[in-house]
C-alpha cells in the first residue's frame, strides 16, 4: 500500500453555466471514489430517462439532489485521486447555499479551481461587473485560499481557437490580479469537461497548447487539469495550535449517544480529552473519534470527524458552537470584536446600528455594527478617516461588532478559520471581514462540567 496520500481540499468556483458540475463530475467519475456499482446504477437510470449519453454532470446532479434531500452521501463520493493527493471537492457550486458554504467552507479549501466558459458571450457574462465569478474569486482570496487554478472550459465550442484562448487568458489574468492573485502562480488549462480534453489526458485538439506553468515554491509545468491539481503546494496544517473544532451538526445516535460532527481547524482531538464547547459553556470528555465510519486515534486539522461525548444532550450544543481543549486555551464566547470589514456590494450606506447576519465558521448570527472606528485604504491598510459616519461599497473600515447572541470567534492571526466572516443581507454577500481582536466573555465559570469531565480530569 505504501504511505497514505496526503489530503487536500479544493473548491470549484465560477459562473453558473461555466460547466462546473460536468468538470467536477468528470474528475470524480474517472479518478474517483464513486464505486462501479453506483456508476452502473446511475448509467442505467440515465439510459431509462433517455440521458443515455451519460454525461458527468448527471453524476453530480444525483449526488447533489441526494444531498439536498438530506440523504447524507458518503463524502467519499466527492473525492478523487491524483498521483500525490487524495482530493476532496468541498462544494460543487450550484448548491443552494454556495456563498454561505464558501465562507464557512472556504476556510477549508487549499486551492480554488476557477472554471471559465470560453463560449462567445459566456465568458463576458461570467466576469462582468456583477458576474458571480468576480464575487466567488474575491471571496476565495479574502478568505485565505491563496492557490488558484484556472480552467478555460468548453473550448470545443470555440473550435479550439488559440486566439480566443489567448484573449481569455489575458482578460482573466487582469481580473484575478485585481482580486489579489499573482497570475504567475496560477496554471491556466484549456479543457472540455464534457469531452474530457486536457482533463486527465493530453488533448490532440490543441496542438498550439504548450502546457501550463507556475512559479511558486518551485517551478512546475504540466499539460492537464489533473496535473495542475497534483502540483498544488502542500498546505501546512496547524497541528501545533490549541484545538478549535466548529460544529457542523450534532447527531443523536442510538446506542452511542450524542455525536457532534465538524472539521478540525487547528490542533488535534483524541479520545480521553476533556473538551469545552463555547459559547455553550459545556465541558465534557471525548469518548472516541471517528472519520468515514472508522475509529481514529486522533483527528488532525482538515479532518471531518464525528466524536461522541458523555452526559451531554443534543439540546445543549449546536451547529456554530466550537469545541476546544479545556486545558489549553479553551474557546470562549465573546461580548464584541473588532474587524476589518470590506463592503463588496451594498446598495446604500452602512452606518452604526446596521445589524446583518454574519457567517463565521459554522455560526450564523446577527451582529450589530456598533461603532465605525476608522475608514482605511484597502490596499495599504492605512487609516484615511477616523470615526466615519457611513461606509459604502468599495470601502474598508475597522468596525466594532456586537453579536446579538453568544458566539465564539477568534482573531484571524490566532486562528484564521475562526477569524474571517461574510456579512449577508438582501440574499447576497454585502461584505467580508477579518477579525482583529476579540473581547472574550468570562462567563464560563457558571458553565456545565459533566461527571465524565471531572472523572477524566482525575486520571
From Swiss-Prot:
Instruction: Output the superkingdom of the source species.
Output: Eukaryota
Tell me any Pfam family this protein matches.
Answer: GTP_EFTU
UniProt-recorded Gene Ontology molecular function terms: GTP binding; GTPase activity; translation elongation factor activity
Q: What keywords were assigned to this record?
A: Cytoplasm, Elongation factor, GTP-binding, Methylation, Nucleotide-binding, Protein biosynthesis
Return the annotated region ranges for G4: 153-156
PROSITE patterns recorded:
G_TR_1, G_TR_2
Where are residues bearing N6,N6-dimethyllysine located in the sequence? 3, 315
Gene3D superfamilies found in the cross-reference section? P-loop containing nucleotide triphosphate hydrolases (3.40.50.300), Translation factors (2.40.30.10)
Q: Where does it mainly reside?
A: cytoplasm
Where in or outside the cell it occurs: the entry states: Cytoplasm
Q: Report residue spans for region: G3.
A: 91-94
- Annotated region (G1) at 14-21
Q: Which residues carry this modification: N6,N6,N6-trimethyllysine?
A: 79
Q: Where is this region: G2?
A: 70-74
Q: Which residues bind GTP?
A: 14-21, 91-95, 153-156
tr-type G domain residues: 5-239
N,N,N-trimethylglycine PTM sites in chain numbering? 2
- List every stretch annotated G5: 192-194
Modified sites of kind N6-methyllysine: 3, 30, 315, 389
Fetch the SUPFAM superfamilies from UniProt. Answer: EF-Tu/eEF-1alpha/eIF2-gamma C-terminal domain, P-loop containing nucleoside triphosphate hydrolases, Translation proteins
Cellular-component GO terms for this entry:
cytoplasm
PANTHER family linked: TRANSLATION FACTOR (PTHR23115)
Similarity section: Belongs to the TRAFAC class translation factor GTPase superfamily. Classic translation factor GTPase family. EF-Tu/EF-1A subfamily.
Please give the function described in this protein's UniProt entry: This protein promotes the GTP-dependent binding of aminoacyl-tRNA to the A-site of ribosomes during protein biosynthesis.
Listed name of the protein: Elongation factor 1-alpha
Please spell out the taxonomic lineage of the organism that makes this protein. Eukaryota, Fungi, Dikarya, Ascomycota, Pezizomycotina
The gene that this protein is the product of is TEF1
Amino acid at each position: 500500500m505504501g504511505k497514505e496520500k496526503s489530503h487536500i481540499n479544493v473548491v470549484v468556483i465560477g459562473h453558473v453555466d461555466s460547466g462546473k458540475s460536468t468538470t467536477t463530475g468528470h474528475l470524480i467519475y474517472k479518478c474517483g471514489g464513486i464505486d462501479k456499482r453506483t456508476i452502473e446504477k446511475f448509467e442505467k437510470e440515465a439510459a431509462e430517462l433517455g440521458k443515455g449519453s451519460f454525461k458527468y454532470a448527471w453524476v453530480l446532479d444525483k449526488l447533489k439532489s441526494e444531498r439536498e434531500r438530506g440523504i447524507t452521501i458518503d463524502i467519499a463520493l466527492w473525492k478523487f485521486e491524483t498521483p500525490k493527493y487524495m482530493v476532496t471537492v468541498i462544494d460543487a457550486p450550484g448548491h443552494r447555499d454556495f456563498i454561505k458554504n464558501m465562507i464557512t467552507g472556504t476556510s477549508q479549501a487549499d486551492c480554488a479551481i476557477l472554471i471559465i466558459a470560453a463560449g462567445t458571450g459566456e465568458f463576458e457574462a461570467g466576469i462582468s461587473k456583477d458576474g458571480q465569478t468576480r464575487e466567488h474569486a474575491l471571496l476565495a482570496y479574502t478568505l485565505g485560499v491563496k492557490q488558484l487554478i484556472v480552467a478555460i472550459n468548453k473550448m470545443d465550442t470555440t473550435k479550439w481557437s488559440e486566439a480566443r484562448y489567448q484573449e481569455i487568458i489575458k482578460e482573466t489574468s487582469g481580473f484575478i490580479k485585481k482580486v489579489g492573485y499573482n497570475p504567475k502562480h496560477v496554471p491556466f488549462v484549456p479543457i472540455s469537461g464534457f469531452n474530457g480534453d486536457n482533463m486527465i489526458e493530453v488533448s490532440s485538439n490543441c496542438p498550439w497548447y504548450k502546457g501550463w506553468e507556475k512559479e511558486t515554491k518551485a517551478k512546475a509545468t504540466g499539460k492537464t487539469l489533473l496535473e495542475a491539481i497534483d502540483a498544488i503546494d502542500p498546505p501546512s496544517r496547524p497541528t501545533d495550535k490549541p484545538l478549535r473544532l466548529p460544529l457542523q451538526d450534532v447527531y443523536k445516535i442510538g446506542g452511542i449517544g450524542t455525536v457532534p460532527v465538524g472539521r478540525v481547524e487547528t490542533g488535534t482531538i483524541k479520545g480521553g480529552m476533556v473538551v469545552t464547547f463555547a459559547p455553550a459553556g459545556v465541558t465534557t470528555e471525548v469518548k472516541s473519534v471517528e472519520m468515514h465510519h472508522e475509529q481514529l486515534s486522533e483527528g488532525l486539522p482538515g479532518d471531518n470527524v464525528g466524536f461522541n461525548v458523555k452526559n451531554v444532550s443534543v439540546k445543549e450544543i449546536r451547529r456554530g458552537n466550537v469545541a476546544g481543549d479545556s486545558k489549553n486555551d479553551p474557546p470562549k464566547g465573546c461580548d464584541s470584536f473588532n474587524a476589518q470589514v470590506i463592503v463588496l456590494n451594498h446598495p446604500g450606506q452602512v452606518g452604526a446600528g446596521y445589524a446583518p447576519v454574519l457567517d463565521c465558521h459554522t455560526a450564523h448570527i446577527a451582529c450589530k455594527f456598533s461603532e465605525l472606528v476608522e475608514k482605511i485604504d484597502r490596499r495599504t491598510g492605512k487609516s484615511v478617516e477616523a470615526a466615519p459616519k457611513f461606509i459604502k461599497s468599495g470601502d474598508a473600515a475597522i468596525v466594532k461588532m456586537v453579536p446579538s447572541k453568544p458566539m465564539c470567534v477568534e482573531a484571524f492571526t490566532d486562528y484564521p478559520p475562526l477569524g474571517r466572516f461574510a456579512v449577508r443581507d438582501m440574499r447576497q454577500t454585502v461584505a467580508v471581514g477579518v477579525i482583529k481582536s476579540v473581547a472574550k466573555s468570562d462567563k464560563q465559570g457558571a458553565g456545565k462540567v459533566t461527571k465524565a469531565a471531572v472523572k477524566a480530569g482525575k486520571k
